[in-house]
Amino acid sequence: MASPPAQERPDVPLHGGFTRFELELEFVQCLANPVYLNYLATQKYFDKPEFVAYLDYLQYFAEPKYIKFLHHPGPTLRALELLQQERFRQDIITPGLANKLQIEGQRNAVPSQKD
């Protein structure tokens, strides 16, 4: 399923000991955290065209051969989808929206208990 470790593949360049894919995988999974999205917005990352283009590039994780590497594909891909919208990138700067998304995510992660 997974490819051999980078140390066994000398043809794959490393960045700080990790492959580009490993770094992108870790980063894209961070996008599932609404508080992190709020942080990126407050730091003005979403105002940078090159960063927005990078978010678009990361949509390759929605492809079946890559989605299997995501720990939480639903929230990760939903965040990536929302980040393609300029309005969302502007609105996530408000802590209220980040909080609302976090609460919704927690509700969806925990099965509801019935009496």
From Swiss-Prot:
Listed GO biological process terms: regulation of transcription by RNA polymerase II
Source taxonomy: Eukaryota, Fungi, Dikarya, Ascomycota, Pezizomycotina
Entry's localization field: Nucleus
Signal peptide: none
A matching Pfam family: Med31
GO cellular component, one term: core mediator complex
Function, as annotated: Component of the Mediator complex, a coactivator involved in the regulated transcription of nearly all RNA polymerase II-dependent genes. Mediator functions as a bridge to convey information from gene-specific regulatory proteins to the basal RNA polymerase II transcription machinery. Mediator is recruited to promoters by direct interactions with regulatory proteins and serves as a scaffold for the assembly of a functional preinitiation complex with RNA polymerase II and the general transcription factors.
Recorded superkingdom: Eukaryota
Assembly, per entry: Component of the Mediator complex.
Organism: Phaeosphaeria nodorum (strain SN15 / ATCC MYA-4574 / FGSC 10173) (Glume blotch fungus)
Predominant cellular place of this UniProt entry's protein: nucleus
A GO molecular function held by the record: transcription coregulator activity
Keyword ATP-binding attached: no
InterPro entries: Med31_sf (IPR038089), Mediator_Med31 (IPR008831)
Keywords from the UniProt entry: Activator, Nucleus, Transcription, Transcription regulation
Family: Belongs to the Mediator complex subunit 31 family.
Gene name, Swiss-Prot/TrEMBL: SOH1
Protein's name according to its UniProt entry: Mediator of RNA polymerase II transcription subunit 31
